[in-house]
Amino acid sequence: MGSAEQACGCKGARFCALCETTERVKKLRVVEDKHVNYKVFIYDHIRQIAIPTTNLNSQSSLEDIIDESTSCQSVSTDGSIEIDGLTLIHNFLSESEESKILNMIDTVEWAQSQSGRRKQDYGPKVNFKHKKVKTDTFVGMPEYADMLLNKMSEYDVKKLGNYQPFEMCNLEYEEVKKSAIEMHQDDMWIWGNRLISINLINGSVMTLSNDNKSFLCYVHMPHRSLLCMADECRYDWKHGVLAHHIRGRRIALTMREAAKDFAEGGELYEKYGAELIRLGNIRVPLSKTSV
């Protein structure tokens, strides 16, 4: 294995700027843009609808998407769609709250991940293929979790309240590494309905695709915003962050809650759920003063 591949965590069909010229990546079959003929929408967070647009396509830049997300607020709603379960909160964090969280995040060692990302994991080790869970390295959630969960409840207790995280993962994206995360759906065996992503340092775009309807929707996530994907958005749409939508450094603070089988009363509560909930309520101290 070459030094470039040793410097990143990519394998299989995934690659980043550090390994894109290696023999492994050169041998990969070029995948055609499957979204080239999809109908494109831009999300209007004010009216909470997705507006059809001919100004964007499957390769649109971050800057073009930002411009369109602003201008779409004054256009007709003809042809618009609602994506049930999609919630975008601008300025979820204040500058001082973000600064305190970042100071704690950067005291923790980062691990290499795939597609040019680095990560910090708080949660169980999950074997999705064999449906097994290990908790030996799960020692709790970082101390700033309580501040985030309280703010979520205060903002909208119905949509965001009573959130019991089973996992918190900080994902670092860097423009120079061409960091990305491919279009995907999160596992549905262990992870529940609401997926949370908070944008630190810089904003980006969450790209959504509904392959059954051939729809593509861009959701501009500004700096310090919170995105929740649940219900239809969670189960009928794929989501991803494309490399050309990253500027500078961005950290996505992500949270996942338990699937129903792992919650109290579920089939896997006694086997896994109870212990995961107990561990998820422990806080790992990262600073001398609390957020």
Swiss-Prot record:
Function description: Dioxygenase that specifically demethylates DNA methylated on the 6th position of adenine (N(6)-methyladenosine) DNA. N(6)-methyladenosine (m6A) DNA is involved in epigenetic transgenerational inheritance. Plays an essential role in DNA replication and repair in the germline during meiosis. Binds to components of the DNA replication machinery such as top-2, and directs their localization to DNA to control DNA replication.
GO cellular component: contractile ring; midbody; nucleus
Primary residence: nucleus
Chain positions recorded as 2-oxoglutarate binding sites: 171-173
An MF annotation (GO) of this entry: 2-oxoglutarate-dependent dioxygenase activity
SUBUNIT field: Interacts with top-2; the interaction is required for localization of top-2 to DNA. Also interacts with mtss-1, his-24, ule-3, C18B2.3, pgl-1, ceh-93, mcm-4 and F37C4.5.
Classification via InterPro entries: AlkB-like_sf, ALKBH4
Entry protein name: DNA N6-methyl adenine demethylase
Family statement drawn from the similarity comment of this UniProt entry: Belongs to the alkB family.
Cofactor(s) needed: Fe(2+)
Lineage: Eukaryota, Metazoa, Ecdysozoa, Nematoda, Chromadorea
Residue sites binding Fe cation per the record: 184, 186, 239
